[in-house]
């Protein structure tokens, strides 16, 4: 049975329809403004990388041109072959050194931070919160603050052994962040899950590796990415400790493209593009897990 509309309900209905129509008109406009703003932000952050790539394919004359042109007169793709045989910088060995140090420091951090984060998350020992606060405070220290002490401690390490020193240093400086973020993920897993595994006969280590670690995999990936990138970009400790050019990582070796009499900016930017390719590949492979780790880690 339908209820007839009264004389007073018709204006109300018309007003409601007018309001809905106005909202529908405003929604596309607001969405367009949001998309434009997001696009401008993306362009703002991508512009340095675009400029770096464009400079990497310029000729020496284009780089030295005054006033400079943003676009090259011709694409000098041969720069990507020339840098591998440039006499002042051994890009291949420097790239190998960077990879060895970054991978070694990341594995070291995982080996130490995983059980430490699990213990902090699962056991309420005296001084737990001060310990976490102290761990977080160590993030304020940088290798430049301890440059003199690091040099005195590791200056006698010669040859490729100096890579081990850089692995230890970078591992130590990234350990606190890994413990902090991984303990948050371990804390998000209910204790009842571990208790059930212990009741089924698993030991504590078996429970951590077989039960807890698969559940906090996004957090582990997040820690791995941050530690790897921080080590890949590290400059201060490598600059202080590594004196031989053939052992220097890319961050220390690249400035040698800018010599006293010749400044090969195009080769330096070419090497910069080569240096970020491994990081881009890693992001492409683990993008979904990284985003999942960054989002799920904020919810218990």
Where are these regions (language model features)?
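A structural signal for multi-pass alpha-helical bundles of membrane permease subunits
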Residues: 31-300
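Short, Lys/Arg-rich, polar N-terminal cytosolic tail immediately upstream
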Residues: 1-27
């Amino acid at each position: 049975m339908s209820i007839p509309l009264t004389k007073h309900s018709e204006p109300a209905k018309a007003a409601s329809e007018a309001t809905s129509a106005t909202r529908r008109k405003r929604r596309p406009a607001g969405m367009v403004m949001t998309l434009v703003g997001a696009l401008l932000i993306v362009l703002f952050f991508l512009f340095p990388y675009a400029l770096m790539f464009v400079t990497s394919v310029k000729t020496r004359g284009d780089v030295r041109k005054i006033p400079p042109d943003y676009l090259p007169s011709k694409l000098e793709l041969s720069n990507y072959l020339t840098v591998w045989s440039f006499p002042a910088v051994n890009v291949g060995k420097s790239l190998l050194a960077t990879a060895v140090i970054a991978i070694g420091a990341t594995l070291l951090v995982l080996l130490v931070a995983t059980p430490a984060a699990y213990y902090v998350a699962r056991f309420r020992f005296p001084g737990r919160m001060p310990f976490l606060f102290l761990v977080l405070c160590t993030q304020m220290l940088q290798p430049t603050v301890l440059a003199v002490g690091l040099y005195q401690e590791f200056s006698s390490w010669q040859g490729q052994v100096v890579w081990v020193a850089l692995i230890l240093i970078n591992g130590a400086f990234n350990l606190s962040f890994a413990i902090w973020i991984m303990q948050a993920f371990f804390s998000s897993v209910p204790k009842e899950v571990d208790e059930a595994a212990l009741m089924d006969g698993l030991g504590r280590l078996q429970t951590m590796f077989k039960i807890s670690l698969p559940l906090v995999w996004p957090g582990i990936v997040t820690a791995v990415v941050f530690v790897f990138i921080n080590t890949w970009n590290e400059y201060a400790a490598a600059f202080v400790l590594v004196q031989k050019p053939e052992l220097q990582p890319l961050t220390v070796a690249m400035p040698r493209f800018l010599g006293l009499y010749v400044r090969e900016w195009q080769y330096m930017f070419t090497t910069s593009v080569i240096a970020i390719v491994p990081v881009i590949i890693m992001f492409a492979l683990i993008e979904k897990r990284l985003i999942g780790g960054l989002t799920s880690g904020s919810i218990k």
